[in-house]
Amino acid sequence: MAKIGFVSLGCPKALVDSEQILSRLKALGYETSPSYEEAELVIVNTCGFINEAVEESLEVIGEALKENGKVVVTGCLGARPEKIRERHPQVLAITGPGEVERVLEAVQVVLPAPRDPFLDLIPPQVKLTPRHYAYVKLSEGCDHRCSFCIIPKLRGRLRSRDAADVLAEAARLVATGTKELLLVAQDLSAYGVDLGHRESLWGDRPVRAELKDLLAHMAELGAWIRLHYVYPYPHVKDLLPLMAEGKVLPYLDVPLQHASPRILRLMRRPGGYESHLKALKAWREVVPELALRSTFIVGFPGETEEDFQILLDFLEEAELDRVGVFAYSPVEGAEANRLPDPVPEEVKEERKARLLELQARVSLRKNQRFVGKTLEVLVDELPEPGLAVGRTYRDSPGIDGVVYVETDGTVRVGERIPVRILRADTYDLHGVQA
């Protein structure tokens, strides 16, 4: 049977694309190979968001060519085929992000499909995450025009899925053991705008392609629902009642990017120091236990020490639960590249280190507030007898902290258990099964 090697790079949205490609390949009768040597062809799903990601993608393509020789490239970097051909002219085919059919066509040119999918039962969806959690993509593309970002050029304008289609996928996942649904998009709050928030039928029930209505129906499935990448203004307030009612996890991933109003204007992003703090205060009044994650860019062109200090002051006062930080990296094709006053690399790195040092203090302070409390933990791993590693509502897989739990030895992966917190580190918690 024909074997395909597969490498998936980039964000959770790219991971969903990889799962779709692998599921379709499985339906056509292909097997996946864990090694380059055993595979008859390798697919590389690339990332092209920042220069470091581009370089990593090009290096992986080169490695696959060296070890295997037959490579099909897809994903965000595939939207810039000249970049790939310049370094690796021998790749078999290049497709852009989300172009599943073109990937399948490219594979079948080299390796004809082992079977006719119309004559066989379609196998279950291939998942690249553990069985108990899954990413569900609500939309593709983005209509925002942030000056530092080229996602609209790579992935196109906003294209939302019908609500019934999303709910059907979520229901299938929950029926097969998924305990946590992580909803992803470039901007979840824009979901359905391109569809005019039209209705579709889920069973015999009409559901609007609008985030609040979708979530209200999805909550009936009983899984944890976690939201990633929600534009900060103005839609967050509409989602808070669902969190207060326990229908959606009280967790928000809101990329604020900066706190200096001047820098945010250059980024073409909304808000600033005062408006950010006002919004956070209003959200926490509705959902006091709300966990907030955000990402920030330091060293953006024109960022002065004063601008950076505004960001530090904001983080001290905002007390965000989780923070990611990037030193600004010029992305080929981004409008921000034309801005004057670039920040020297050593200054970018120094500011990044200062921000992380401050946030580490904030994170420890926040974590220590949970000592003595009992939290619900979703078990991810059982590394040894009597020990479990899991996550609370505050922790998204792979990017946030974890909870190390002393257990009675009977818990299973995917189970939700009460845990009494005994100790807190900067990013992680330690406790005992209650």
UniProtKB/Swiss-Prot annotation:
Keyword Transferase: yes
Lineage: superkingdom: Bacteria
Domain (MTTase N-terminal) ranges: 2-112
Binding residues annotated for [4Fe-4S] cluster 1, in chain numbering: C11, C47, C76
Matches recorded under InterPro entries: Elp3/MiaA/NifB-like_rSAM, Methylthiotransferase, Methylthiotransferase_CS, Methylthiotransferase_N, Methylthiotransferase_N_sf, NA-bd_OB-fold, Ribosomal_uS12_MeSTrfase_RimO, rSAM
Span of domain Radical SAM core: 128-365
Protein localization: Cytoplasm
Reactions catalysed, as given in the entry: L-aspartate(89)-[ribosomal protein uS12]-hydrogen + (sulfur carrier)-SH + AH2 + 2 S-adenosyl-L-methionine = 3-methylsulfanyl-L-aspartate(89)-[ribosomal protein uS12]-hydrogen + (sulfur carrier)-H + 5'-deoxyadenosine + L-methionine + A + S-adenosyl-L-homocysteine + 2 H(+)
Enzyme class: transferase
Keyword terms, alphabetized: 4Fe-4S, Cytoplasm, Iron, Iron-sulfur, Metal-binding, S-adenosyl-L-methionine, Transferase
UniProt GO MF annotations: 4 iron, 4 sulfur cluster binding; aspartic acid methylthiotransferase activity; metal ion binding; protein methylthiotransferase activity
Any single Gene Ontology cellular-component annotation: cytosol
Reported cofactor(s): [4Fe-4S] cluster
Protein family membership: Belongs to the methylthiotransferase family. RimO subfamily.
Name the record gives this protein: Ribosomal protein uS12 methylthiotransferase RimO
Organism, scientific name: Thermus thermophilus (strain ATCC 27634 / DSM 579 / HB8)
Classification of source organism: Bacteria, Thermotogati, Deinococcota, Deinococci, Thermales
Gene name, Swiss-Prot/TrEMBL: rimO
